[in-house]
Regions:
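Phosphate-backbone binding interfaces of nucleic-acid-interacting proteins
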Residues: 684, 690-772
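Internal maturation/activation junctions in enzymes
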Residues: 247, 353-376, 380, 384, ...
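Function-dense linear segments that define catalytic or interfacial modules
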Residues: 46, 65-73, 90-115, 119-163, ...
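Conserved, charged catalytic cores of large soluble enzymes
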Residues: 14-86, 163-177, 187-190, 194-304, ...
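Short cysteine-rich clusters marking metal-coordination/redox-active sites
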Residues: 800-803, 816-819
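Catalytic alpha/beta core of large soluble enzyme barrels
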Residues: 34, 319-322, 361-366, 450, ...
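Short, Gly/Pro- and small/polar-rich lid/capping loops
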Residues: 613-669, 779-796, 802
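Residues immediately within or flanking Cys/His clusters that coordinate Zn2+
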Residues: 797, 813, 821
């Protein structure tokens, strides 16, 4: 039997008097699994000049020493006091009880500027501001920060720009510029994460919802729609009422941004849409590939601790930190699984670790040296920290409590309430010791007359990497599976067998390699179909796909009651989930006051981070996913692929303007009208030839209808001209501008003239004069042409109407040498 390579559990290390420092460090290093070490070497363990890397114990010593030194250098503590704090900081990390987030682990004590994981930057509505923010963002990305941006302040596509007297390209075009720029920057062993948010009342919201419909597009951003109570009430209470966007304080119709096949903005059309219809578009995106997510802006601002700074409009990349512009938060998480002793929580130890962690993260702020000074200044003003949790699902496993139950939610509420309360008590103690955050006056804490060191304290981050090296479940998420393969952004794969489950089987004397247990785990990741296992084990060891979306949402809402900021959580759906189920989930989460909502339907992306099944069948991820996205679309169901790429004609505006041309054809004078859209591009075409109901009139009408549909579907006019120009008919005719071979050729020539030579009349009177001149000039000129030219001057050989062969001039008449057709009879 082949040996399994899986993550093994290691009991939390406890410092004892009998261990020397060297022995203690050796024990710490030995406590990490193969997977954990692989990931730590890639991301967190510093490299020495000789090419070797530090050990995990050395990492923790480096971080603990660097943060404890703050107490001496800034707050005047003695060396003994600082050493005591250093030992406490080291212990909570070495015991896997608490872990700071990645940037803190990587940079503290390493001679590298200390920066926060999470920052929000403004994107305001001037070109100078847009590119100033991009410059600041590039510097912060390079340093290792994750960034959030609200693109809701940018004017909609098609709006006038004063400086250039042109029209705005719209927020999505600038989002693409940011995305491309960030794709070039790679942070210390990791790709930069970014969040783009647009409020639901922005006129370009439809364009935003669909901007990541093709997998691999805008791949350096998560996107979320900022919903409001007004919008959700309209969805649930007035589903048929029109929905109006808001811009500059005015209610206007939302619009669809029109793009050419190469993606360039060519215009926009107003939409008559209800809130429910817009909501359905959002749901469709979430159902299709998990994006966009949703953030509840009104709920976030109801709990905004710094109302004097204005409303919050954005979050960090993972959505758990609602921040003002230039505000920051450093994250860290308590591993709840480490506090279970004999099936019960050790709340005394949890209290100690919580308070130590608050001090640790407060000290991180004093070391900040962001490449953008405004960020460091704001951090000193608010002193936000994001103390969260991980290992919750494993904690429930050890306690024998089912995740998707009232008991599970009660445990979650109790432990989060305890941590939140202890964190606040510690912040009050630090305020007495070191002073309040400088923006305390005007905050919610000043109104409550509570002296606080930190504006906000708790959050729940996804903990993807730090939970990997502590071998525990992520955040408040249920385990994805009891056996799975995790794939990171660089394509590296890590196999995991849940250590708590493996230990539970061992305690009961159950052999995992018998009765098809391991085979079922590899196949499905779940034990729900293993009836040979005791029922209490099957009830306790549930995984994400065993849990209904409703229970996922209820758990998130239970935690949200006791979290200062927000929670990063994914609501997992099976692949068979319907759009209606996703929609119901969004409504439920809003009603339960969840601040953020991310839904994911299993298998709806070509590449996903966690996978169940044989590793050989799991797709690898590389930086080339963007360029490969189109090829990978063949994996989509055919109907979804067709929907994704189907062209839809835009709605015709009620009023358009254009020009009418007259051209002589072999069948009489053809009058062609070309109408333009608001940007001056051809929108539709009409042609009149002969009497209504005649053969040539019906042909020209049919042709013009198809051309108009193509134009309104954003097909390039040059493509249409190329297809029609040069088509030969049996009755060509000469004009002063050359040969007109057929009706299609005549229409193509007029379209070409319209887009390449026509100039817009200065006013309506000039337009009328132009039309009159156009209508009379060809007639006068044709008389002169007739006198000077003969049939031999047709130039290009027209086609025979009978067989398609060439017509030639014979005996004063056009005749076909192939079939004998003669125009003269």
């Amino acid at each position: 039997m082949k040996k399994r390579v899986v993550a093994k559990a290691v009991t939390a290390i406890k410092k004892t008097a009998v261990l020397s420092p060297a022995a203690r460090d050796k024990q710490v290093n030995a406590s990490f699994s193969e997977n954990a070490l692989k990931m730590m070497k890639k991301r967190y363990l510093a490299k020495r000049e000789d090419g070797t890397q530090e050990t995990p114990a050395e990492l923790f010593h480096r971080v603990a020493r660097g943060l404890a030194d703050v107490e001496k250098t800034k707050y005047g503590k003695s060396a003994t006091e600082a050493a005591k704090l250093e030992a406490e900081f080291f212990d909570i990390m070495a015991n896997k009880e608490h872990t700071p987030a990645g940037r803190t682990l990587t940079n503290v004590g390493n001679g590298t500027p200390i920066i926060a994981n999470c920052i929000v930057l403004p994107v305001m509505d001037t070109l100078d501001d847009i590119f100033q923010t991009l410059k600041e963002a590039a510097l912060l990305q390079q340093a290792g920060s994750g960034l959030g941006f609200s693109f809701g302040h940018l004017r909609p596509a098609g709006m006038p720009t004063k400086r250039t007297n042109g029209m705005s390209s719209g927020p999505i075009e600038f989002l693409k510029i940011y995305n491309t720029s960030f794709g070039i920057i790679k942070q210390q062993g990791r790709h930069g994460a970014n969040m783009a948010i647009m409020p639901v009342h922005h006129p370009d919201i439809m364009d935003f919802i669909h901007c990541k419909k093709v997998e691999g597009e805008i791949r350096n951003f998560n996107i979320s729609v900022g919903i409001t109570d007004e919008f959700m009430k309209a969805v649930t209470e007035k589903p048929d009422a029109p929905w109006l966007a808001t811009w500059n304080g005015k209610k206007i119709k939302p619009h669809r941004v029109l793009r050419s096949p190469n993606g360039a903005v060519i215009g926009f059309e107003e939409l008559d849409i209800t809130a429910k219809q817009l909501f359905d578009e959002l749901v469709e995106g979430a159902w299709f590939n998990g994006e966009p997510g949703v953030v509840n802006l009104d709920e976030a601002n109801r709990t905004n601790p710094l109302p004097q700074l204005g409303e919050i409009d954005c979050t960090n990349p993972c959505g758990e930190q609602f921040l003002h512009h230039y505000d920051v938060c450093n994250l860290g998480s308590i591993n709840l699984s480490a506090f279970v002793k004999n099936g019960k929580m050790d709340y005394a130890r949890l209290k100690q670790v919580t308070r130590t962690a608050v001090r640790l993260h407060d000290n991180v702020i004093d070391l900040y040296a962001h490449p953008v000074q405004k960020v460091t200044d704001r951090a000193q003003g608010t002193r936000r920290i994001g103390l969260g949790i991980m290992g919750f699902a494993d904690m429930l496993y050890k306690m024998g409590v089912q995740y998707n139950s009232d008991a599970g939610r009660a445990v979650g509420e109790k432990v989060m309430s305890f941590i939140n309360e202890e964190a606040r008590k510690m912040s009050q103690l630090l305020a007495k010791e070191k002073g309040t955050f400088t923006l305390w006056q005007g905050s919610v804490w000043s109104k409550k007359k509570m002296k606080m060191r930190n504006a906000a304290l708790t959050t729940v981050a996804p903990t993807g990497s730090i939970s990997m090296f502590t071998d525990c479940s992520s955040g408040i998420e249920p385990n994805f599976a009891l056996y799975f393969t995790k794939q990171d952004k660089d394509g590296l794969q890590y196999k995991y067998l849940n250590p708590v489950f493996e230990a539970a089987l061992k305690d009961r004397g159950i052999d995992i390699d018998k009765d098809g247990i391991m085979e079922e785990l590899i196949k499905s990741g779940s034990v729900q179909n293993l009836m040979s296992l005791p029922k209490d084990l099957r009830d306790t060891f549930v995984v994400s796909m065993d849990i209904s979306a409703e229970d996922h949402i209820k758990m998130q809402a239970a935690f949200q009651k006791h979290v200062d900021n927000s929670i990063s959580k994914t609501i997992n759906f099976p692949n068979s989930a319907t759009r209606e189920e996703v929609a119901a989930g969004y409504v439920m989460a809003w009603k339960l006051k969840c601040k953020g909502m991310t839904f994911y339907r299993d298998g709806s992306r070509q590449v996903q981070v966690l996978n169940i099944g044989d590793a050989s069948k799991i797709k690898s991820t590389t930086d080339a996913i963007g360029s490969a996205a189109a090829a990978k679309q063949i994996e989509k169901p055919l109907n979804l692929l067709m929907d994704q790429h189907r062209l839809t004609p835009r709605i015709r505006p009620e009023v358009v303007s254009g020009r009418t041309y007259k051209v002589k054809t072999g069948y009489g004078s053809l009058f062609v009208t070309v109408n333009d859209d608001e940007l001056g591009a051809p929108l539709e075409i009409f042609a009149t030839l002969g009497k209504s109901g005649g053969f040539f009139q019906e042909q020209s009408e049919a042709l013009c209808r198809l051309i108009s549909v193509a134009l309104r579907s954003h097909i390039k006019v040059e493509e249409i001209i190329q297809q029609l120009k040069g088509i030969r008919g049996p009755m060509p005719v000469m004009t002063n501008k050359g040969t007109v071979l057929s009706l299609p050729d005549a229409i193509a020539q007029i379209l070409e003239e319209h887009v390449t030579h026509a100039t817009k009349p200065a006013n309506e009177q000039a337009q009328v004069a132009e039309l009159v001149a156009a209508a009379t000039a060809p007639v006068q000129q044709s008389k002169e042409v007739k006198a000077k030219q003969s049939l031999a001057s047709y130039g290009m050989m027209p086609g025979c109407p009978e067989c398609g062969g060439n017509l030639t001039l014979k005996e004063g008449c056009m005749a076909c040498g192939s079939c004998g057709f003669s125009r003269c009879g």
